[in-house]
């Protein structure tokens, strides 16, 4: 089907849905039609803008052929033609992007997990830096950042930390952060001024609701134990720590941050549900293609995606070959939008090639 025919078909469908909604339908039929109508609104607006520009260009070209036009009018028409010819490819691209298959998880909130990798205490300190960076980014975007669990080292580092980030389209913005983040800097304890390299792993999961993932009680094994602090000593006299294992998948989540066993269980279930949902998403994607789609690079969490070089003041994303020489703005202030927007644009460009 030609591109123009496809657009006409979408406009017809949108008009038919509008007529259907105004005809007085009720119940499930109304809900279904309303959902379809709302989903088409954005792409229809872009199609109409594209068609309008095409129509105006055709009119301008026809007008230019008329006899007896003075030079001033001719120049004005040529300027209009030039502007329209330049805008059409951009408008066409906007339509194609709007037509790309949507990831159902994009509109969801997210759970982010940061773990120290290779590099000992320096890796744990870097994990804390990354976790705080995402917290600041969430604040800039107006999202709600709720810490779920932190396992600290006692001197400012995090062995691992997780948080729930709630807001519109959070997952669509943060999903490309999954992977290995590498840091190059001189540790405070380094007397010779040598640069050390360490790493931390980031995992971003769409936050799943109960309607997305139904977990049966019979599929869970729940163990309780006493919470322990640094050095392994018990910090609570009651069994407030919780370990939940999802028996069918073997996925396990342990939590001991709260003094209340009930709160630890609720948070652990939230993380568990997100991990199971992400696992199901991956299986579906792998069934559709040999390599994962809907991710920049392979999407493998073992893939090194970004380097933070403090001596040079730069942050480099290896997937899109983008380097920014403003490490403080990115790391300390959470100004990640340049990377986020470039990664989304790169992802869209790759998907457009498949159309």
Curated annotation (Swiss-Prot):
Lineage: Bacteria, Pseudomonadati, Pseudomonadota, Alphaproteobacteria, Rickettsiales
Entry's localization field: Cytoplasm
One Pfam entry name: RF-1
Function: Peptide chain release factor 1 directs the termination of translation in response to the peptide chain termination codons UAG and UAA.
Modified residues (N5-methylglutamine): 233
SUPFAM superfamilies noted in UniProt: Release factor
Protein name (record): Peptide chain release factor 1
SMART domains to which the protein is assigned, alphabetical: PCRF
Record note on modification: Methylated by PrmC. Methylation increases the termination efficiency of RF1.
Family, per entry: Belongs to the prokaryotic/mitochondrial release factor family.
Extent of the signal sequence: none
Biased segments, Basic and acidic residues type: 282-293
Disulfide bridge positions per record: none
Transmembrane intervals: none
Organism this protein belongs to: Rickettsia rickettsii (strain Sheila Smith)
Cellular component terms per the entry's GO annotation: cytoplasm
Listed GO MF terms: translation release factor activity, codon specific
Record keywords, A-Z: Cytoplasm, Methylation, Protein biosynthesis
Gene3D superfamilies: 3.30.160.20, 3.30.70.1660, 6.10.140.1950
Region (Disordered): 282-305
